[in-house]
């Protein structure tokens, strides 16, 4: 593994000279890295023994290098550099994978979908990881290298940002049992803690202030576990002429998820039977 990482790190430093004409060990290393991601054997970010997420930068570099190594080619319904994950899959492969993908769901190769997951017509980008029994609802997007935990619900039209463009240092991470409300957006490497609930239309980036209404504590870049978050606003500074200034968007923690909240956002096991 150390040799693989070394080859990818060195190639990334010389990425300006990497083209579809490149041959040899670089191509083989990137292909092996993408296969590891596609099979779920390795992840762009992994939870360490200390409970902190560790980003495997070499895998993210491999994803970026793959765009330099591959030219566009015709594919069913498109013309792109990245093949689709399910191309030429047999019924047996789908059964073995153990998840459901509704027609219209688009998953790029290099993304991993765990058993029991349900993909409505949605988009899952290269390098992403979708955990067991997670629902990615209609028109939702899971961005490049995003890490989605188990028993998560990504509601309709929600967006989970990627790392490729604009280039981000770390992926978005959604913890187990979290709920992302319809049309919400989580981007720029933000971590959403286990069991957190984002209501409809919450937008959180790295610089978004997440204010705990009960304590006044301000979080940035991380939603605490089991926090229930809604859109809010901060009073603006007065304008030079003394008039009230425009308010600024923020996210507000209104409470900690209780049993009633969890029952409203819980996984419907009737929808998770992939073999039926």
From Swiss-Prot:
Its EC number is 2.3.1.117. Keywords: Acyltransferase, Amino-acid biosynthesis, Cytoplasm, Diaminopimelate biosynthesis, Lysine biosynthesis, Repeat, Transferase. The keyword Cell inner membrane does not apply. It is an enzyme of class 2 (transferase). GO terms for molecular function: 2,3,4,5-tetrahydropyridine-2,6-dicarboxylate N-succinyltransferase activity. Gene3D superfamilies: Hexapeptide repeat proteins (2.160.10.10), Tetrahydrodipicolinate-N-succinyltransferase, N-terminal domain (1.10.166.10). The keyword rRNA-binding does not apply. GO terms for cellular component: cytoplasm. Homotrimer. This is 2,3,4,5-tetrahydropyridine-2,6-dicarboxylate N-succinyltransferase. Its main location: cytoplasm. InterPro entries: DapD_Trfase_Hexpep_rpt_fam, Hexapep, THP_succinylTrfase_dom1, THP_succinylTrfase_N_sf, Trans_hexapeptide_repeat, Trimer_LpxA-like_sf. One of its GO terms (biological process) is lysine biosynthetic process via diaminopimelate. It is found in: Cytoplasm. It catalyses: (S)-2,3,4,5-tetrahydrodipicolinate + succinyl-CoA + H2O = (S)-2-succinylamino-6-oxoheptanedioate + CoA. Pathway: Amino-acid biosynthesis; L-lysine biosynthesis via DAP pathway; LL-2,6-diaminopimelate from (S)-tetrahydrodipicolinate (succinylase route): step 1/3. Belongs to the transferase hexapeptide repeat family. Disulfide bonds: none annotated. Substrate binds at residues 100, 137. It comes from Zymomonas mobilis subsp. mobilis (strain ATCC 31821 / ZM4 / CP4). PANTHER family: 2,3,4,5-TETRAHYDROPYRIDINE-2,6-DICARBOXYLATE N-ACETYLTRANSFERASE, ACETYLTRANSFERASE.
């Amino acid at each position: 593994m150390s040799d693989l990482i070394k080859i990818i790190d060195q190639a990334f430093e010389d990425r300006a000279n990497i083209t579809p004409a490149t041959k040899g060990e670089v191509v083989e290393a990137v292909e092996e890295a993408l296969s590891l991601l596609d099979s779920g054997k390795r992840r762009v970010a992994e939870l360490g023994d200390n409970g902190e997420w560790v980003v495997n930068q070499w895998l993210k570099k491999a994803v970026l290098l793959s765009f330099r190594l591959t030219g566009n080619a015709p594919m069913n319904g498109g013309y792109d550099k990245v093949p689709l994950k399910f191309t030429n899959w047999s019924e047996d492969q789908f059964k073995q994978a153990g998840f459901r993908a509704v027609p219209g769901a688009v998953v790029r190769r290099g993304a991993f979908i765990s058993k029991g997951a349900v993909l409505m017509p949605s988009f899952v980008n290269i390098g992403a990881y979708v955990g067991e029994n997670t629902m990615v609802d209609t028109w939702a997007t899971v961005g490049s290298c995003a890490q989605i935990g188990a028993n998560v619900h990504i509601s309709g039209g929600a967006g989970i940002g990627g790392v490729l463009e604009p280039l981000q240092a770390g992926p978005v991470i959604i913890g187990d049992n979290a709920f992302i409300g319809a049309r919400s957006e989580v981007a720029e490497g933000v971590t959403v803690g286990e069991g957190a609930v984002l209501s409809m239309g919450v937008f959180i980036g790295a610089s978004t202030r997440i204010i705990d209404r009960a304590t006044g504590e301000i979080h940035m870049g991380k939603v605490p576990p089991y926090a229930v978050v809604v859109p809010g606003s901060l009073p603006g500074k007065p304008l030079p002429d003394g008039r009230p200034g425009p308010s600024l968007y923020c996210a507000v923690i209104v409470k900690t998820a209780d049993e009633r909240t969890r029952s409203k956002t819980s996984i419907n096991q009737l929808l998770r039977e992939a073999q039926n």
